[in-house]
A protein has these predicted regions:
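Conserved nucleotide-binding and Mg2+-coordinating catalytic segments in signaling enzymes
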Residues: 17-37, 53-67, 75
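Signal-transducing coiled-coil linker helices
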Residues: 1-25, 32-43, 47
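Short helix/loop segment flanking the catalytic signature motif in cyclic-nucleotide metabolism enzymes
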Residues: 73, 100-118
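Catalytic-core segments of nucleotide cyclases and related cyclic-nucleotide turnover enzymes
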Residues: 112-119, 126-129, 143-174
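A short pre-motif secondary-structure segment
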Residues: 90-93, 132
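Active-site-flanking beta-strand signature of metal-NTP-handling nucleotidyl enzymes
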Residues: 49-54, 91
Length: 175
């Protein structure tokens, strides 16, 4: 009995440490470590779809309202992204205001529909009485063996697409 209890405790602790190593504490999303671990195990790139996201104006909210407000911005954005994308792939927080989703097979989802859902959720969030005007720049790329030598090339194309979207969204004026 005693030995079984010790084994159970060790197993629970190991699971907790694994979760702490893979999860972002603020958002509960998978973290950069998990992203690198998952992408290093990624054997089949053929139908891979990568979405990348960047939270616009986070620095403004941190500077004007404090880091608690910035943290709220990040957690609210993560909640929206999880709501839309979690059925399709893993959501990772890979930087302070950067997220991404890896989807194994782009044929299993409608990309334009997912982006439309993201914009609708942003609008619903922003229509409520909040101090934060949430704006999530979004880019994506589908693996193309003609142009992508590896996952890094796919990431670069997704980032370029996201930066184009970020420029389009920059017309936003602060409340």
């Amino acid at each position: 009995e005693y030995f079984a209890g010790i084994c159970c405790l060790v197993c629970r602790r190991a699971a907790l440490y694994r979760e702490l190593a893979e999860k972002d504490l603020l958002t509960g999303c998978y973290n950069r470590n998990a992203y690198h671990e998952d992408t290093s195990r990624c054997k089949k790139l053929t139908n891979l779809l990568l979405f990348v996201f960047d939270l616009n104006n986070l620095k403004y909210y941190n500077d004007k309202f404090g880091h608690d407000c910035g943290d709220q911005y990040i957690t609210d954005a993560a909640h929206i992204l999880r709501k839309i994308f979690s059925r399709h792939g893993k959501l990772y927080r890979i930087g302070g205001d950067e997220f991404c989703v890896l989807i194994d097979d782009h044929n299993t989802c409608d990309i334009s529909h997912l982006i439309c859902c993201l914009r609708k959720e942003e609008a619903v969030y922003n229509a409520s009485s909040r101090n934060i005007h949430l704006q999530i720049a979004c880019g994506y790329a589908v693996f193309d063996s003609r142009t992508d030598a590896d996952l890094d090339a796919l990431q670069k194309r997704a980032d370029q697409d996201m930066y184009e979207n970020k420029k389009q969204l920059k017309t936003f004026s602060y409340r």
